[in-house]
Amino acid sequence: KMIVGDITSLDLEDTFGKLAGTIDVVIGGPPCQGFSQKGQRKTIHDERNFLFKYYVSVVELVNPKYFVMENVPNLLTAEGGYFRHEIEELFNKLGYSLEYGVLNASDYGVPQNRRRAVIIGKLNGDAPKLPVPKRNDVTIWDAISDLAYLESGEGSEEQEYKYPAESDYEK
């Protein structure tokens, strides 16, 4: 189940408590505007930067074997690592070991240069290592060169391919 909305308006116990022990992995990421390099960062004074505590509460209620949390890279370094340390401490108290770092989608075959902080947690054991970069440079051209050219106003929700795939990525 995916919840799209403001987690602060939910009754966490009512929403997630009944899922305890039935979910293997919780995947999500708290809002990151306060950590973003775009615009002014107020980090320690921005209440949005503490929404990770709701994520921790959900993990505590659901009690999954694993969790994966993602955010902007500054989550790990803001305020001298304060937030990273806080996250580590909270999850360690729940019995989770952590592995974390910054991954770039382009290192895993995605035609996008997108760096994200990733935190993986495992309950009662060593957290899995982050995946090793595979660095197979996929360009936007590799991904979409077989799409038809459209003029303004043309097209529909679905359309047949007009050209054969030119790259392994398109296949």
Where are these regions (language model features)?
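Core alpha/beta nucleotide-donor-binding catalytic domains of modification enzymes
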Residues: 1-63, 73-77, 82-85
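Residue-level signal for pocket-adjacent positions within structured domains
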Residues: 2, 30, 39, 46, ...
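A structure-centric signal for secondary-structure junctions around beta-strands
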Residues: 4, 22, 113-116, 141
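Generic structural "secondary-structure junction" signal
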Residues: 9-12, 37, 46, 74-78, ...
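Generic N-terminal simple sequence motifs
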Residues: 26-27, 60, 107, 127, ...
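Short, surface-exposed, polar/charged, turn-prone segments marking secondary-structure boundaries
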Residues: 31, 52-56, 94-97, 128-130, ...
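Conserved Class I SAM-dependent methyltransferase catalytic core
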Residues: 48-113, 117-122
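S-adenosyl-L-methionine-dependent DNA methyltransferase catalytic core
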Residues: 90, 116-171
